[in-house]
Each structure stands twice: as C-alpha cells, then as structure tokens.
Amino acid sequence: MRSALTAIALLALAGAAFASPAQTPPTPEAAATLVIYNHTDPQSQALAKYYAGRRGIPADHLLGIDCSSKEEISRDEFLVDIRSPIRNAFTAHGWWRVETGEDGQHYVRSASIRFVAVMRGVPLKIQSSTRDTALEAHADIQPGTPMALIAGQNEACVDSEIAAMFSLIPETAGFIPNPYFQQSVPALTLPPAHTPLLVCRLDGPSDAIVRHMIDAAIATEKTGLWGWAYLDERSILSPGYVVGDEWLTSAGSAMRRQGIPVIADYASEVLPPGFPMTDAAVYYGWYTQDVAGPFALPGFKFLPGAVAVHIHSYSARTVRDPNAAWAGPLLARGAAATMGNVYEPYLELTVHLDILQDRLMNGLTLAEAAYTATPGLSWMNVVLGDPLYRPYQSWSALTPTTGVHPNIWQRYRQIVLDANGDPLQAIPELTKLAIDAKTSMPLEALGQAQAAAGQFDTALQTLRDAAKVEHSRLIRFRLALERIEILRRAGRKDDAVEAIKEDLGTFDSDEEQTTLGRIALAINPPPPPTPSPIPSHTP
C-alpha cells in the first residue's frame, strides 16, 4: 500500500438456518434500488431476479446491459457498453431529472434511484488508458508532483465510476471528492447532489456464494449479527501508515462501547494460521497481498452475515478466485460483505473502517455506511454485499420475543450498555455471567478491554480467570495466545518467552506447537548470521 499524505490535499480540492427465499416486503430503499446485470450472461440475470425477489425490488428496476463478462475492460468498453446504457435508462425511465443551471452546467436535481446492485457477470475494473482529455479536470495541478500522479490515474473500479454518475462529469482521471463522505444520515433524506449513487456489487467466486451473501444478509437482519469482532493491527509507527491502525483502534473502541466483544492483535505480522477465530462476526485487519493466517486454513468459516475487510492495495484485484487477494476469499469463507481495491488506491483513499463500523452500528445500510466511509469516487474502491443490508437492524428490538432467551452475546451487550458502554465498569456482572453461563466469553472480552486501556496486569489475571471457566481446549489455547501478546505489548519479552515455554508443555498438538513456535520466533528472532571476513590478500 503506497501512502500519499498529499492525497489529503487533493481531497481539499474537492450455522444459522436461512428462511426459504420468499419475497421480503418492499422498503423505501428497495423501491429506490436498481439491479444491473449482464444481459449476455444467463446466470447474471438469474442472480438479478433472485436478489430483486428477495428484497421486493420492482421488476422494472432490473436493467440488463450487453457487456463483456471479463473482470477487466478498457475505458472505451466501459463508456460504450456500461455507462451509456445506464445513463440512457435513467433518462428513458425518468429515474432522474437533469436541469441546466445558470452557469450552463447540467445538474441532477432529483432521482428516484439511489441504490444500485451490480450483479456477478458485470466487469469489475477499467484498465488504465492514455487519454489526454482525462486530465482536464485537474489542469490546476502542477505536473510532476505527487498530486499530479494521483490526478493522472484513470484506471478505476466500474462500480466507483457508476457511483459518480450523478456528477455528470464527462470523464475524469484521479478521483472525485465524495459529497457523502463522513455524513451520518440516510441517503434518502438528502438530495442527489449530496450523495453518489450508492453502488454495491453482488459478486464472488461462484453463484452459490452470491446467493449466500443475499440470504445471509436478510436472515441476519432478523436474528442479529452476534459474535466476536477481530482486529488485526500492525503497531506501525510510520507517519504515512499509522492511520490504518488508528482506524482499527477507533473501530474497536466504538464496538466495545456498543457491547460488541472485541479481540485485538497488535503484532506486526498477520494473525498466525493456528489462531482460533471462533464465532467471527466482524474482521478488520491488514496487511498481506493474499489471504493468509486463519482464513487460509481448510474449513474456516465466518458467521452468517459477517462483515470482513482486509486493507491491501489490491485486495479486490479479482473477486472470482476463492484463494487470491482478499475479497473473494473472505466471501468464499462465509462473509456477507467486504470492501476492497481493484488497483492501488493510496491508503488515505481507502475505506475508513472506523466510520464504516460506526455507521453500520447506527443503522445505515451497507451501501450508505460504505460510502460515508469512502473519500473519493471514480477511484479504485469496491463494496461487495447487499447494498440494503443492515447487520445491526435487530438492535432496535432489544427485548426478546416472549419465550425466547437472549443469547450470551445479547446478555453481554446489555450488561455493557447498562454500564454506560464501559466493560471496565461491569466487572462483577461480567464475572457472574461467565460463571452462570459456564463460558469464558464475558471475561475474555473484559480482559481484552482492560488490555486496550493499558491495564496489562489486570488483563492477564482476567484472562487466567477466563481459562478456569472455559471447557473448550481451543478457546483455552486462544486465551494463552492472548496472554502472550499482552506480555509482549507490555514490554515483558522475557516473560512472554517463558509463557510460551510453559504453554508448549500444555498445548502439545502439532498445530498448537507450530503456532507457539512461530510466535516465539516473532518475539525473539535469532540473530542474523555473522558475515564471513573478507580473505586477506597474500602477495
């Protein structure tokens, strides 16, 4: 990921069983949604009809376009085969009202379509071209500067170009500042001049995965997204990159305040393959090119409805391979929603994960949350998932249905909310919940919150107490790994190494031993080999 602090200056220039696939009653958002599919691909059309039926989207809001089925296309192919028919359809169906302003420019004054679902089969990205006219919008930028480098790029994600359609700019290089960035209100409450078209893609390695994304989103809205949030930070100090960790830290703090239990790792390496990621509902992390860590293991699965994002420059260079990059693999492993980059975006122009998570928790749809968290349009970003998905919709009905007992996650959340969003003020209640429910989860979440607050010794003791009530060997192993990580963060490297030696005697499976060995090498790497002396020349 290349960092571009100057990009900021450029901005200133601007398990569960799913219900049968019955039709969901239409919502205002569904009535404002357009579904775009590849008319030459029968599977793309079938997926479009399936999604529209599940969400109650009007049948006349399905738009088939004749386009390539390749993931990467040329700029000319995009303009002729994708953008032109979409614009023509908006005009022909009266989906927008375009007027000429006093300055002679055209403006979208109103629009009945505000959300777009792009189906599998429609191209993903537009390769770079050598069009000189693309730089006209940035004629004020001095050639040869970093900003000129960004402004001169005209490769882009297809979806991000469609999202910029309300701007009516003929063609751009660089990015267009997103007017919806950092907003916090539903898109339908704003005029189209203040929002982009909110474009998400229902795409992935297979048709079955796309159907799962649709079904999981709708089912989770009814049952709730309950489980762990996993954060994988890097502890990076470079000024150009530290913002990535800051997003994750901020997202973690917000989730803890909302009663979502968080497990955070701060080692510079990605989570090791043997790290037990159970009940994964949310994952935010960085930074490797291709899927790695626990996600690369056979059998790993997210909870249905999970939201998972891995920051990398090319995390969505393809979405159709279950083992390449990150977007496709995360979806193949059960996530319902992810975001990524089809080409190099620069870090500051990727999705701001703290804003994304905040807006999701405050009831916005996936499309709304994603675009409030994305600084630019006509750029490299892609959102994969049902645009209308609200993962925390069930939070508006905290009282369980009569006769239905709240699950452990709901009980944990209610305790934290009763403590004004601070797990550290609910130690007796969380301890009692762990003992009564015979699970370590409340204490593990408490220990993580204590560690995040810098209370390392207290956190270590809490995690030891958690291990005493936990019956699962897998979870006890994770608790051991968390204690080792806290010792490392506290600067107690020798104690961390001793803890690893002790745990090697307790956790003796091949996978456990390998995981502990990798962590030991990361904490205490062997010294580099001593170079051989240069032989002296003897005359």
Features from the language model and the residues they span:
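Generic helix N-cap/helix-start motif at coil->alpha-helix transitions
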Residues: 404-411, 437-444, 473-481, 510-515
